[in-house]
Amino acid sequence: MGSDFKAIPLIDISPLVGKIDDPSMVNDEDLLQVVQMLDDACREAGFFYVKGHGIADSLMKQVRDVTQKFFQLPYEEKLKIKMTPQSGYRGYQRVGENITKGKPDMHEAIDCYTPIEPGKYGDLAKPMVGSNLWPKYPSNFDVLLENYISLLRDLSRKIMRGIALALGAPVDAFEGTTAGDPFWVCRLIGYPVSTDIPEEQRTDTGCGAHTDYGLLTLVNQDDDICALEVRNQSGEWIYAKPIPGTFVCNIGDMLKVWSNGIYQPTLHRVVNNSPRYRVSVAFFYESNFDAAVEPVEFCRERTGGVAKYEKVVYGEHLVQKVLTNFVM
């Protein structure tokens, strides 16, 4: 939320996607231009679109389509993968079960996380131990989503390499103990038409104003429904209008801490005033689950020499949010 931006920048990241893992990439002018655009976007808006990302438009649409087909199933069928504390907070949640700042959100969703084996991370991860609950229908759901998530993990890693360079850090600064084993979250979200929600439950907000927890979010949204809004420094809400074939990206809380506030996450919300059901698939690229994220030295030096934020263990941050996010 660094400026009074009126629009969200669009960045063609194809030079970065193609060359960021090449040791000679520091001399590539096209790649360095993308890095500069990432820096500008992270400072000014905290949001940006990416094209040239290498994920097929047909795959992005297929993921949205199977998500919509699942939400069209009878309620009893959807409840077969119902989210519970026993499921590690993975699975289906009905409209109004997710809460933002005390108010129910008018969406339904499937929540997926990096699978966690019992005992991994000790007590830190105990509430989230488990594997993802994939629906039986549509029949290709699990294979499709697992492939999609794998591709987005790698794309996110490449974008974070560009963001590392934008901050003046080594290209692999977000690897190793920070995000060498990145945790991920994927939320498949459906926003019903408001008139389809019982009046006693209805609010005007599909998802209340919030910032994201981790490093980077990539949103695959319907091509033709405006609903995602981003707040600029003056408090105006700016539409993140759909641009077919792009991801809407935004930075999160962990990047704010790591950069000592050089990059700030931006408040955003979803208001679905469309007469049609809306689908959005959000992929969250996080630090290592057990990473202790704190302002790094060279970012402190660039911001007055003092850490503006205390150390945060990402897994503690996530578990605290998850345990207070739902009414079941």
Swiss-Prot record:
Its main location: cytoplasm. One of its GO terms (cellular component) is cytoplasm. Optimum temperature is 30 degrees Celsius. Keywords: Cytoplasm, Dioxygenase, Iron, Metal-binding, Oxidoreductase, Vitamin C. Optimum pH is 8.0. Fe cation binds at H210, D212, H268. Its cofactor is Fe(2+); L-ascorbate. The keyword tRNA processing does not apply. Gene3D superfamilies: B-lactam Antibiotic, Isopenicillin N Synthase, Chain (2.60.120.330). Induction: Induced by cadmium. Binds 1 Fe(2+) ion per subunit. The keyword Oxidoreductase applies. It catalyses: L-homoarginine + 2-oxoglutarate + O2 = 6-hydroxy-L-homoarginine + succinate + CO2; melatonin + 2-oxoglutarate + O2 = 2-hydroxymelatonin + succinate + CO2. Expressed in roots and shoots. 2-oxoglutarate binds at R278. One of its GO terms (molecular function) is L-ascorbic acid binding. It comes from the Eukaryota. Its EC number is 1.14.11.-. It is found in: Cytoplasm. Residues 183-288 form the Fe2OG dioxygenase domain. Belongs to the iron/ascorbate-dependent oxidoreductase family. 2-oxoglutarate-dependent dioxygenase catalyzing homoarginine 6-hydroxylation thus producing 6-hydroxy-L-homoarginine. Guanidine (Gd) is in turn synthesized by the spontaneous conversion of 6-hydroxy-L-homoarginine to (S)-2-amino-6-oxohexanoate (RHEA:79843); guanidine is a nitrogen-rich compound that can serve as a defense or signaling substance. Involved in melatonin degradation. Catalyzes the hydroxylation of melatonin to produce 2-hydroxymelatonin. This is Homoarginine-6-hydroxylase 2-ODD-233. It comes from Oryza sativa subsp. japonica.
